[in-house]
Regions:
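Terminal, low-structured helical/coil segments at or just beyond the last alpha-helical repeat
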Residues: 29, 240-244, 248-280
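Helix-start (N-cap) detector for alpha-helical repeat units in TPR-like alpha-solenoids
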Residues: 29-30, 63-67, 100-101, 134-135, ...
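Register position in tetratricopeptide repeats
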Residues: 41-42, 75-78, 112-113, 146-147, ...
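Structural marker of alpha-solenoid helical repeat scaffolds
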Residues: 58-61, 95, 129, 163-164, ...
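Canonical tetratricopeptide repeat
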Residues: 67-71, 105, 139, 173, ...
Length: 280
C-alpha cells in the first residue's frame, strides 16, 4: 500500500472540524483530534493512538468518528497492531461503507493475514466504485491466480494495461499467467520485453530462467541466473539451483562452486552433502 492514504483522512478531519461551530464539549473533542494529528505527523504513534481513543470515547456518536477510526487504524497499523488496525478500519466502514481508501487499507491487512477471501470482497467493492483502480485490480488478479481463476485474472491485468500500457506489475502478471497456461512463446516474449525495459532487474532474469527450466533449456537458464547474481546478491536457494543445473550439465567444478556459495548464503552443508559428493 502506498503512503498516499495515510494523511488523507487526517487532513479531511481537520477541515471538517475547523469549519464547524463547536461547543465547549465539542472543543475538547476538536483539541484531542488536533493533538492526535500532530503526534501522528511527529511519528509519536502511541500518544496519537491514545488521543484518538479518548476522542472516540468522549463523543461516540459523532458523525466524524469514521475519519477518526480510519486515522486510528492507520496509526495502529504503523505500530504493528494489525488486529487492532483491522478492527478500527471495520468500525470506520460501518459508518462510511463506500470509502475506497479505507476499503483498500483493510484489504491490505487481510492480505497480510492471509485472509484472501475477505480481501477479495473489499477489492471487489472498490472496483464496483472505481472500476479502473490499479491497486484493487492488481491484488484481485493475484487472488484470482491463487484460486487458479486465470481467465478472471487476465481480465483484471488487461484492464490495467488498457489504461497504463507500461504498468510493470500487470505486465509481469500476464507473463506469469502465460507461463501457468503453458503459453511459453507468449510468456517468453513478454519477459524479454520486460528485461529490455528493466535490464538491471535481476528478478526478471530469474523469471526467465524459471521459464527456460520448464522447457528443458538448462544452458539458457544457467546463463540468466549467472547474470542475475551479478546484478544483485542472491539467496542460497538460487545458488543451489545453479549448482543443480551444473550437475545436470556435468559441470562438476562449477556445481561445487555454486553449492559452496549456497552454504555461505545460509543453506546448511548437511542438506547439500549428497550433492557435494556428486561433484567429486
Amino acid at each position: 500500500m502506498t503512503m498516499k492514504y495515510i494523511y488523507k483522512y487526517i487532513v479531511a478531519a481537520a477541515f471538517m472540524l475547523s469549519v464547524s461551530g463547536v461547543s465547549a464539549y465539542g472543543q475538547e473533542y476538536k483539541d484531542l483530534v488536533e493533538k492526535a494529528m500532530d503526534y501522528t505527523r511527529k511519528d509519536s504513534l502511541q500518544q496519537a493512538e491514545q488521543l484518538y481513543q479518548q476522542a472516540l470515547k468522549l463523543d461516540p456518536k459523532n458523525a466524524r468518528n469514521a475519519l477518526l477510526f480510519s486515522n486510528l487504524g492507520t496509526v495502529q497499523r504503523r505500530m504493528g497492531k494489525i488486529d487492532d488496525a483491522l478492527q478500527s478500519y471495520t468500525l470506520a466502514l460501518n459508518i462510511i461503507p463506500y470509502s475506497t481508501a479505507i476499503l483498500l487499507n483493510r484489504a491490505t491487512i487481510y492480505m497480510e493475514k492471509g485472509m484472501l477471501d475477505k480481501a477479495y470482497l473489499d477489492y471487489c467493492n472498490v472496483i464496483d466504485l472505481l472500476p479502473e483502480d490499479k491497486e484493487a485490480r492488481l491484488f484481485r488478479a493475484y487472488i484470482y491466480m491463487q484460486r487458479r481463476q486465470y481467465k478472471e485474472a487476465r481480465i483484471d491485468y488487461n484492464v490495467i494495461i488498457g489504461k497504463d500500457f507500461g504498468n510493470k506489475p500487470a505486465r509481469i502478471g500476464l507473463a506469469m499467467l502465460d507461463q501457468k497456461e503453458e503459453k511459453y512463446v507468449s510468456a517468453t516474449d513478454r519477459i524479454n520485453l520486460l528485461i529490455h525495459d528493466y535490464p538491471e532487474d535481476a528478478s526478471l532474469l530469474k523469471m526467465r530462467a524459471n521459464l527456460e527450466l520448464e522447457q528443458g533449456q538448462d544452458e539458457a537458464a544457467l546463463a540468466d541466473l549467472e547474470a542475475a547474481v551479478r546484478r544483485e546478491p542472491s539467496s542460497g536457494e538460487t545458488y543451489e539451483l545453479m549448482g543443480d543445473i551444473c550437475l545436470r550439465l556435468k559441470k562438476k567444478a562449477e556445481a561445487r562452486k555454486y553449492y559452496e556459495e549456497a552454504i555461505q548464503s545460509g543453506v546448511s552443508r548437511a542438506s547439500l552433502s549428497d550433492k557435494l559428493k556428486k561433484c567429486r
